[in-house]
Amino acid sequence: AYTKQEGITNVSGYERFTGRANVTHQTDKVLLEANAMYTNSTQNVNNEGTSFASPIMCYAMTASPSTYPYNEDGSFSSNFPALNGANPIQTETYNYNRATINRFLGSMAATWTIWDNLKLKEAISYDFNQNNERIWWDPRSNDGRSSNGVYQRVMGNRGQLNTQTQLSYNKSFGLHNLDALVGFETEDYKYDYLYANGNQYPSYLP
């Protein structure tokens, strides 16, 4: 499946690819099941809050009908006195905030009918989520001017492994029903996070 959405601001948007597969196999006494899903998402956003790259903040709080983003020669205007000359269109042209997210969710299960309605089920599942974010504040923008450019990287990996063991039995005796279930479950969760930034760049980054 494919999804693409355009944001309400010039450089914002969302794109996603999703794939899914399911397999089931049944024999006389054994049921095998396997499921897998993979998603790749790319998201472009404007910085929010009170940053100079926040167009919503600028337009709603500081811009007026006399404000113009471009000069007559096509260059960016600095006629934004309330923002100390910061032009939000110039800022969003040079700055970026991009995130790529990969997620995998897979599971396998085997159910064995031992005798009559006595069943043993073993299941294992793994959920992995990876986030990779890149943020650039250009020296030509007010966000990065004082530091001569700021580049930030945020990386996070989340992994969760689950296993389940279930022994179940059900039986009907006339008007009576008997159900019994014994189970055991384990969970292993890991999270890795890395943040890094740098400034004082000798040139502009693309």
Please report, for each region that a protein language model flagged, where it lies by residue:
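A cytosolic small-molecule/anion-sensing beta-strand core signal
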Residues: G106
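Surface-exposed loop/interface segments of Gram-negative outer-membrane beta-barrel transport/assembly proteins
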Residues: G7-S12, T18, N22-R103, A123-P206
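Residue-level recognition of beta-strand termini and adjacent short loop/turns
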Residues: D28, T113-W115
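Transmembrane beta-strand segments that form the barrel wall of outer-membrane beta-barrel proteins
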Residues: A1-K4
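An active-site-proximal structural segment forming one wall of the substrate-binding cleft
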Residues: L118
